């Protein structure tokens, strides 16, 4: 948030339900709120950009929150930027992750919530040069969002995931230096 504010000389507001994380952000000079309803109640105008970086997978109702952002927070020509872990690239489940996303399921969730995807990118930065660990999306509100969107189920998810993880493990053995990059100290 701070990097976006500095780079674009923009006003930013963060939402963080965790007291310790919110206090840390506030100590760095960021304007932070506790919840989405608090943000909606305090915001007189809509945002040009809403960023959800590693947030969506923690929400009990990701499509509902995406809809709420669409209808109550995002400007009509605004941008939604989000990133989630790629379900096909990770061996284990995170207990704090209430939802898992593949490229297909993320597209379906965004379509159901009334967004048009401008770009969907898979990447490994900053952890890997080889593996597509994360899904990054840039989207905008649809001009005519569907009123009764029927989700298209993804087929063969267990098989796709098993094959992706086997391929990842093989690549890691063949090229370990590019597979897992060291975490940079700050």
Regions found by a protein language model. Name each.
Residues 1-113, 123-125, 139-141:
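Conserved SAM-binding loop
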Residues 52, 103-186:
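Rossmann-like AdoMet/SAM-dependent catalytic core
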């Amino acid at each position: 948030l701070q990097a976006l504010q500095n780079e674009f000389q923009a006003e930013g507001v963060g939402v963080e339900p965790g007291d310790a994380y919110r206090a840390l952000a506030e100590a760095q000079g960021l304007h932070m709120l506790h919840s989405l309803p608090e943000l909606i109640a305090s915001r007189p105008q809509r945002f040009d950009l809403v960023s959800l970086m590693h947030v969506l997978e923690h929400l009990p109702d990701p499509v509902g929150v995406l809809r709420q952002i669409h209808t109550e927070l995002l400007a009509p020509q605004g941008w939604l930027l989000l990133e989630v872990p790629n379900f096909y690239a990770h061996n284990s489940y995170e207990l704090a992750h209430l939802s898992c996303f593949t490229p297909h399921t993320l597209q379906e969730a965004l379509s159901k919530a009334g967004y048009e995807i401008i770009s969907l990118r898979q990447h490994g930065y900053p952890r890997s040069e080889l593996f597509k660990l994360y899904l990054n999306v840039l989207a905008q509100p649809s001009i005519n969002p569907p009123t009764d969107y029927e989700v298209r189920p993804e087929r063969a998810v267990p098989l796709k995931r098993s094959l992706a993880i086997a391929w990842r493990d093989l690549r890691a053995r063949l090229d370990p230096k590019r597979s897992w990059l060291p975490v940079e100290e700050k």
